[in-house]
């Protein structure tokens, strides 16, 4: 049943969100992975629709350029890995490529990821570290893909893409998880509606 619901959700026939419910959708899609969302919860839900593969786990001391880009502190040691979401286990075409940074005190997250594939990484990190995420900052930008990312998508280097940098903070303003995601151009859109209050 869960696989059937996940498949229908991937096809855009309805959407399921935790603590929100299920909503039937009627929307024409051009291209297998065109997705449109109008809230932040939807973006996290989007990533969790697809199977993930963890690659290239490494310990890294942040240089100034990387720390500045991710909103972290230069010289800090982090554990970085690739979180690749694919269309399905049968069709392992990449949907999104994400570089995730966690701190050494959250190392156990890497073991939990294998056992709890439906849980978001921030959920696992909260459980392991005892920190509670109270704020998420997201920065969207149009950019080009570095070669190691374009190779995963099987497109030329410097192909256009959407980059999303996310920072998950606790109540003290300390980072729990930071990530940098790449989506292929024209496969993802994010819209915001503002309403004037009287």
Describe the residue ranges of each PLM region.
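C-terminal all-alpha effector/ligand-binding and dimerization domain
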Residues: 50-198
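Short, charge-rich binding segments
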Residues: 14-15, 45, 71-74
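A generic structural motif
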Residues: 18, 28, 58-61
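N-terminal helix-turn-helix
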Residues: 1-25
């Amino acid at each position: 049943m869960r696989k059937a619901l996940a498949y229908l959700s991937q096809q855009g026939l309805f959407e399921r969100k935790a603590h929100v419910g299920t909503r039937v959708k009627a929307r024409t899609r051009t291209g297998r992975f065109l997705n449109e969302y109008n809230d932040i919860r939807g973006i996290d839900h989007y990533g969790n629709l697809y199977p993930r593969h963890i690659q290239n786990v490494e310990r890294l001391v942040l240089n100034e350029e990387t720390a500045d880009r991710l909103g972290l502190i230069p010289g800090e040691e982090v554990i970085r890995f690739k979180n690749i979401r694919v269309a399905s286990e049968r069709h392992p075409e990449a949907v999104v490529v994400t570089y995730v940074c966690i701190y050494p005190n959250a190392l156990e997250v890497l073991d939990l990821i294998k056992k709890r594939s439906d849980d978001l990484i921030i959920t696992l990190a909260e459980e392991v570290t005892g920190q509670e995420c109270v704020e998420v900052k997201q920065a969207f930008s149009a950019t080009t893909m570095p070669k190691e990312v374009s190779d995963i998508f099987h497109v030329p280097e410097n192909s256009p893409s959407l980059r999303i940098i996310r920072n998950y903070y606790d109540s003290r303003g300390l980072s729990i998880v930071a990530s940098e995601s790449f989506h292929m151009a024209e496969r993802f859109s994010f819209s915001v509606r503002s309403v004037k209050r009287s």
